[in-house]
Amino acid sequence: MVAEALGLAVILLGFLTVLGLGVTELLASSAGGFKLLLAPVVGLAILEIGFEWLTNAVEPWVVPLVLVVPFGALSTVMIWRSHKSLLSQWRDVLVAGIATLTFYMALLAIVFSRGFFTLAGWPSDNVFIYTPSAEYLLDHSMPAAYHIPALQTVGSWYLAYTGTAFPGTTGSIDAAVSDILRWPLHALFDPINAFGLALTVASIWFFVRVGLAASFWTAVATALLLMTNQFIYWTLGNGFHQEAQALPIFVAGLALTAYALRSGSAGAAALAGIVAGSLPGLYFPLAVVFAVCATGCVIAHVAWPVADRRKLVRPLVAALAAGVMASAFALYNLIAAHGLSLWLSASDARSAPGGVSRFPRPQYLAGTVPYSHVWDPLAQPLGHLETLLLPALFAAAAIVYLLGGVGLARAITQGRRPEAALMLAGLLFGTYEALIVRYPYGFTKVVCYLAPFASAFIAYAAVDLGKWVKQIPSISARSRPANALGIAALVLILLACANSSRDMALMWLVNPPTFSRADLGLSSLAAVIPKGASVLVDDPGASYAELVKIGAVGYALPDRSFRVYAGTNRIGTFLEQDVLPTPCTFDFVIGPKPPQGAYILIKSDAEEALNVYQWAATTCP
């Protein structure tokens, strides 16, 4: 399993680098050797934009093959032209790459602990939205919006009637990778999420080295802090598929925005626009947070007295033009095809997703005290040692906030005000979610989105703290003790955060995986239910666990028309699930008890407590 997962990551990393290297080198050459850090993230953004534009016409697996021809050719040309300078920062690129793959493997610990590739985390949108959508897209293009799909499955209905909220991107990358590499979808879901989250290391590394002009060791410390952030493991376990793909793009887009405004580079600004242009179609809320943070960055440039405001015109125009062009199709779907109204009307999303019904306290937000201790669906008791060390964990949380504030102050005094401003703008948006909207889930998600930047500013304060102290006349003689103090604080935080992340990973293992081996064994149903048949799952008293099982049944029966009657529990999980259709209009009925009419039992699954019945009459009365 480990070798297979690592091989998948290497393939994805190589492909995305080929896809994004040429554009990155062409537009952001002024960033020197550090631009190579962004190549795979730029490649991911290009791929997502390709899905947004093309999957209404072709099956998703065609998109990467179409894109790799022009963008791969461009990468080849740019490598040939700039091969001497491409690896000028080879140490940063190498260590960031190793950190990315290490983080990827650490995130997949919950999958490896299951002993087989499956949906390893909490059962939610992974089984009800993303996997069914990807399964439909294995051999179909996106269905037309708001039209009854020709093949009526859980995935096709979702894509047709709510897919405009994620135009072109829901399930596309899973379907494409599955078709090309021949991996089953249930084995790909968590690795793709882990890979996207791990790519954030490269994005934030660029921000630290170029945006903050910090040292190599500051970038290493930032990566370690991010790799031990419990909210990243929480994101993976919850199966937040769109966010996992969008997070590295979000970070890279902001890093490029700050760099472009500072350097006055229209090319880097255009690249920032292209990268950010993938966000509205990928995950609209993160596009909103991006806009808020980028606006803060621009205001910091414009408002500062010494700024040459004329230098901002070209990069701003380039960024806006590139962003609008890249996101045009997504914006059309969000506005004209009512995708935005779906986001605005999703009032029930405030209690269901993420299991967040209350605001996390500051010690949990800092990451040093395990959030798994209070996360409502699977709250776990603190261990004996954790209970004894709780005062130290609280102290570490206080140090996190202190270092974060010092890091922001240092950035401001070192002339890195736009970089500090984007973080402050994000914090203001989180405050708005908490105090004005009173939305615990939205607030917690903003904390997740800002985790990479929080890691950067904490590391920026802790590493080489003595250099900053030396610039303060009253305490300049204490620079060496300040360095030692900063490193000691960093070690304490890393140990506490690593413990919290370990507890978060263990929390997911308390619950069975979303798809157990028995659930995956339901694929045997395909042997008795031919393709093209119509199937009704009849289980009106379905509990939440049984709804997940119904999702597994649907996954086991691709290319069959699929309808569910499951009562009112978690209403909206399946289309009109509380309306019983006429059973005799279906070729097969699956359920715990016999349906009405001339159905005969053809198969039983005692382990899953499901029976398969086939219509035996010639007409439906």
Language-model-derived ranges and their functions:
Residues 1-96:
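Membrane-embedded, hydrophobic transmembrane alpha-helices
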Residues 128, 194-197, 243-249, 288-289, ...:
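Hydrophobic/aromatic-rich transmembrane helices and adjacent perimembrane loops
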Residues 317-324, 461-502:
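Signature aromatic-anchored transmembrane alpha helix within multi-pass, membrane-resident enzymes
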